[in-house]
Amino acid sequence: MRYIEFDEKRKFDIVPVGRVAIDFNPTDIHKPLSESRNFNKYLGGSPANIAVGLARLGKKVGFIGKVSDDRFGEFVVNYFKKEGIDVSEISKAKNGESLGLTFTEILSPTESSILMYRNGIADLQLDVDDIDEDYIKNTKAIVISGTALAMSPSREAALKALRLAKKNGTVVIFDVDYREYNWKNKDEIAIYYSIVGKESDIIMGSREEFDLMEGLIAKDSTDEETAKRWLDYGNKIVVIKHGKDGSTAYTRDGKAYRIKPFPVKLLKSFGGGDAYASAFIYGILEGWDMMDALEFGSASAAMLVASHSCSEDMPTVEAIKEFIKKEKEEYGEMVARS
């Protein structure tokens, strides 16, 4: 069943817009960050991870973003090229801005934290002049990340991408992706999140992220009230995530589809959301039934929280299907389905 119609004649399946960074994950885990001495370097940032995830799943992917004019910027561009992601709309920062850096701390499978360096960074220098209408016209969907809205000029660039997408019939997916860095206050968050949320076709976010988006609209909404609100604005799918308690997708026909996490031996408690998003979007692009798309996303998320990296360990279609098969053989057919 198709919940959203995509223009199948377009060159790209998906084009994320916004944050790209470098992740440093410790190899000497189960220590506080102050004591870790050895790290592996990976591509990071939710839009970038989603781009890699969908490329691994066989989709034609582009990217709109800005990187540092240095070796880290080269690393990003070369990594994208290796994954088959189009880099023609990735530009270099002109005033010495650096790529965002993220250091992770893995104290235990359930206790992880993230330290981000987000001042004077390249991705927030994305400008309206960097947004090309023909590029957006040639993709089935764009993904706008909430972090792109945190500061100007990236904020205006993201809003231009949104307007051009609406003008040209390009599907808009809003990945709320809240990070406290760079925002001035909660009112600012609510204003810009709601601007994009009201114009999107799909919104994906945690309960806490929806609370931030609704900060100037309503307080203490239930999931059902939140879903109805954003569906009434025109969204076709609203996904509300509750971490270890699973997630629910709401659709315009009034239905709610619930999925649980797959049981897996955790290595870390971060990174699953980007894998979930890429695999879920894949299912929607393929026209799958909602429960199948959610199950695919949940399986991909489970695989990522059991691995060391985010981008590097994004799975293929075959790997996710094999994971689901093994999980169902061990735990039963309804292991993740509510």
Swiss-Prot record:
EC numbers, comma separated: 2.7.1.92
Per its record, the protein catalyses:
5-dehydro-2-deoxy-D-gluconate + ATP = 6-phospho-5-dehydro-2-deoxy-D-gluconate + ADP + H(+)
Q: Name one GO molecular function term.
A: 5-dehydro-2-deoxygluconokinase activity
Its pathway, per UniProt, is: Polyol metabolism; myo-inositol degradation into acetyl-CoA; acetyl-CoA from myo-inositol: step 5/7
Q: Name one GO biological process term.
A: inositol catabolic process
The broad enzyme category this protein falls into is: transferase
- Is Aminoacyl-tRNA synthetase one of the keywords? no
UniProt keyword list: ATP-binding, Kinase, Nucleotide-binding, Transferase
Q: Which PROSITE patterns match?
A: PFKB_KINASES_2 (PS00584)
Member of which family? Answer: Belongs to the carbohydrate kinase PfkB family.
Function of this protein?
A: Catalyzes the phosphorylation of 5-dehydro-2-deoxy-D-gluconate (2-deoxy-5-keto-D-gluconate or DKG) to 6-phospho-5-dehydro-2-deoxy-D-gluconate (DKGP).
Q: What is this protein identified as? A: 5-dehydro-2-deoxygluconokinase
Name the gene for this chain.
iolC
